[in-house]
Design a protein with these regions (language model features):
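NAD(P)-dependent short-chain dehydrogenase/reductase
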Residues: 189, 193, 203, 207-210, ...
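N-terminal Rossmann-fold cofactor-binding loop
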Residues: 69-74
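Mid/C-terminal beta-alpha module of Rossmann-like enzyme folds, strongest
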Residues: 261-301
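Conserved Rossmann-fold NAD(P)-dependent oxidoreductase catalytic core, especially the SDR/UDP-sugar
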Residues: 132-134, 144-186
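Catalytic helix-loop patch of NAD(P)-dependent Rossmann-fold dehydrogenases
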Residues: 137, 141, 171-210
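Alpha-helical substrate-binding/gating segment
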Residues: 228-236, 244-278
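NAD(P)H-binding glycine-rich loop region in Rossmannoid oxidoreductase-like domains
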Residues: 87-142
Length: 301
């Protein structure tokens, strides 16, 4: 793991990482707090999983009109929001023919903003050749198809928020990385580099913000969701020697970052979606153990 910081100057509150309602929630700078509450028609890809469980309700709360496209069934979406709040289109966005449907073309023509988080989860399965291919295609082919269709529109959306990952920087644990650093040269770094390059072919009139997302934490899933049962059983501890950096972000912060990015036309380019102060794995494990009243002694190889 590597140490990632962001050059974006947002202030955070100090709070418990286990509680999304009081986690280190981004304070929107004063220049943003006075913005009018612009209601937009948004098209979302890849938002029916761990991040989407909080992102979609937060966008609905802001008053945005949502069209969500996903390979998942509509039943999966019902666990996130009510049917009446969302226009749902089931399709595989990595297949170019899926974009020919009248329903998705109409949604594209009317959308004012796009949030592209599509991608097979990286940490859920072993990295077999087949899974690495799925990780790659679900991101690159989806984004290629999205960009191609956006460029064909007579009226371009105002903004495209495209996911990337801190894996962009490779795996040098001795270096502190900011948005200005060059990419690494391993599988994830090359994937993120190509993913971002495709997104940059967006329509000229569309503002692009690429969010290089860190390790996303929330108690109902992701890395923290896997760690909590182990720690609660008294079997928790750091991974490896505990000296590796953990550049994390709470899911609530990430959703706030995306919401703020929609509103603020001054935000473009690349931002590291991480908390301002990365921690060593030892420190994170010790803090988690203290919060739960459990030991953090058993290192995971």
């Amino acid at each position: 793991m590597i140490k990632i910081v962001s050059l974006i100057n947002c202030k955070f509150n100090n709070a418990n990482i286990l509680d999304g309602s009081t986690s280190k929630v981004i304070k929107i700078p004063l220049s943003l707090s006075n913005l009018n509450r612009e209601i937009m028609k948004l098209l979302l890809t890849g938002c029916t999983g761990f991040i989407g469980r909080e992102l979609i309700p937060s966008l609905i709360k802001e008053g945005h009109s949502l069209t969500v496209i996903s390979r998942q069934s509509k039943g999966q979406l019902k666990t996130i929001a009510n049917d009446q709040d969302i226009n749902f289109i089931q399709m595989n966005p990595a297949e170019s023919s899926s974009w020919n449907k009248e329903e998705i073309q109409n949604a594209l023509k009317s959308c004012e903003g796009v949030i592209n988080l599509a991608g097979e989860p990286i940490a859920e399965k072993r990295w077999t050749d087949a899974h690495c291919k799925e990780i790659t295609n679900s991101r690159l082919e989806t984004t290629k198809n999205l960009i191609k269709n956006l460029r064909n529109l007579k009226k371009s959306p105002k903004v495209l928020i495209n996911a990337s990952a801190i894996g962009f920087y490779g795996s040098n644990p001795q270096t502190e990385f900011t948005e200005e650093n060059i990419p690494g040269n391993d599988f994830l770094a090359n994937l993120c580099k190509e993913w971002e390059s495709i997104a940059k072919n967006k329509p000229r009139a569309t503002r692009l913000l690429i969010v290089r997302i860190g390790i996303v934490l929330a108690k109902d899933g992701g890395a923290l969701g896997k760690m909590l049962p182990i720690f609660r059983a008294g079997l928790g501890g750091p991974i490896g020697d505990g000296k590796q950096w953990m550049s994390w972000i709470h899911r609530t912060d990430l959703c706030n970052l995306i919401n703020a990015s929609i509103k603020n036309s001054a935000w473009s380019g690349v931002v590291n979606g991480v908390a301002p102060n990365p921690v060593r794995m030892n420190e994170f494990s010790n803090s988690l153990g203290q919060v739960l009243g459990r030991p953090s002694l058993l290192a995971v190889p």
